Amino acid sequence: MSCPYAGNGNDHDDSAVPLTTEVGKIYGEYLMLDKLLDAQCMLSEEDKRPVHDEHLFIITHQAYELWFKQIIFEFDSIRDMLDAEVIDETKTLEIVKRLNRVVLILKLLVDQVPILETMTPLDFMDFRKYLAPASGFQSLQFRLIENKLGVLTEQRVRYNQKYSDVFSDEEARNSIRNSEKDPSLLELVQRWLERTPGLEESGFNFWAKFQESVDRFLEAQVQSAMEEPVEKAKNYRLMDIEKRREVYRSIFDPAVHDALVRRGDRRFSHRALQGAIMITFYRDEPRFSQPHQLLTLLMDIDSLITKWRYNHVIMVQRMIGSQQLGTGGSSGYQYLRSTLSDRYKVFLDLFNLSTFLIPREAIPPLDETIRKKLINKSV
């Protein structure tokens, strides 16, 4: 059956006149389907003991790797656009579009796991012996995605060796080394946030105004707590306010913030965190609308990678349990479970921004000077 969108529905029309004399490639040639569809080599079949589900296992992982390649392609283009002193609104829109594409791809990858789970543990055991020493830990493209996103080497969980040592060929190791040296998406987003208009001390000086608003907000909370007639309830409220004051101190005191960065509990520089908070507060302003979408999509990417890791962990536990080693010699389930921690969450600071919110009515109002600046300035 021919494609209904390609013509009048006939398989062949002898009277049709070609629209061009250029020689093109037919569908299969263009997509190189001869290579793509001939790349499923079932080792169980070569061993004269074919296992039906090995084919599903191969297809699923090859599909993952194809989508990983597209994610890397999108990340590289986004990093190129972000690597500039000024990013105009047109580029910001394109970055948002491509990040959204990555989000949709990751949603597809998350939804792909249940297809693999149609295979039972016994079915998997029938061909698992053929997989060693292969392991998902050896997915070069996934490691490149992590590095290009901004997962730091010191934040990684070690299991037997450095993660890059599992790759034996020099080309793969060079790719890993280059991805570690090149500016990551995290670094480029940080630079971009540091340039957020309105942070200048000689201008709107958002950070000073925000501190004043927080002080007034907490003081109002104290006054309200002091009017509490029940002593125990009053003390509890005052204690809670002091805890909140300490939380705010962690962003207002640069030394405390830097200590949290060194400890791995924060990722952004102090200035970049200020920019992220400002964009969050004023996201309804036209100039900050796209930047806010960009930050939201970065969180979506982090969340979906975590969901994919979690689904992978649960699937591995169902297939091999929690005590066996992985086929590549890793600690299997235990190692995978350890990657679900916040140390693998690249844009952790964006998730924690809600900790520092204040009521809408307490947000410092924008003056006319900064409004005009936002109209005329790209971020």
Swiss-Prot record:
Domain of life: Eukaryota
Catalytic function, reaction form: L-tryptophan + O2 = N-formyl-L-kynurenine
Binding site for substrate: 57-61, 128, 327
GO MF terms held by the record: heme binding; metal ion binding; tryptophan 2,3-dioxygenase activity
Cofactor entry: heme
GO BP annotation list: compound eye pigmentation; kynurenine metabolic process; L-tryptophan catabolic process; L-tryptophan catabolic process to acetyl-CoA; L-tryptophan catabolic process to kynurenine; ommochrome biosynthetic process; protein homotetramerization
Pathway: Amino-acid degradation; L-tryptophan degradation via kynurenine pathway; L-kynurenine from L-tryptophan: step 1/2; Pigment biosynthesis; ommochrome biosynthesis
Cofactor note: Binds 1 heme group per subunit.
Keywords of the record: Dioxygenase, Heme, Iron, Metal-binding, Oxidoreductase, Tryptophan catabolism
Pfam families: Trp_dioxygenase (PF03301)
Listed result of changing residue 335 to F: Strongly reduced enzyme activity
Annotated positions binding heme: 312
Cell inner membrane recorded as keyword: no
Enzyme Commission numbers on file: 1.13.11.11
Subunit comment: Homotetramer. Dimer of dimers.
PANTHER family from the UniProt entry: TRYPTOPHAN 2,3-DIOXYGENASE
Function: Heme-dependent dioxygenase that catalyzes the oxidative cleavage of the L-tryptophan (L-Trp) pyrrole ring and converts L-tryptophan to N-formyl-L-kynurenine. Catalyzes the oxidative cleavage of the indole moiety. Required during larval growth to control the level of potentially harmful free tryptophan in the hemolymph. In the adult the same reaction is the first step in the ommochrome biosynthetic pathway.
HAMAP family reported in the protein's UniProt record: T23O (MF_01972)
Family of the protein in this entry: Belongs to the tryptophan 2,3-dioxygenase family.
Name of protein: Tryptophan 2,3-dioxygenase
Name of encoding gene: v
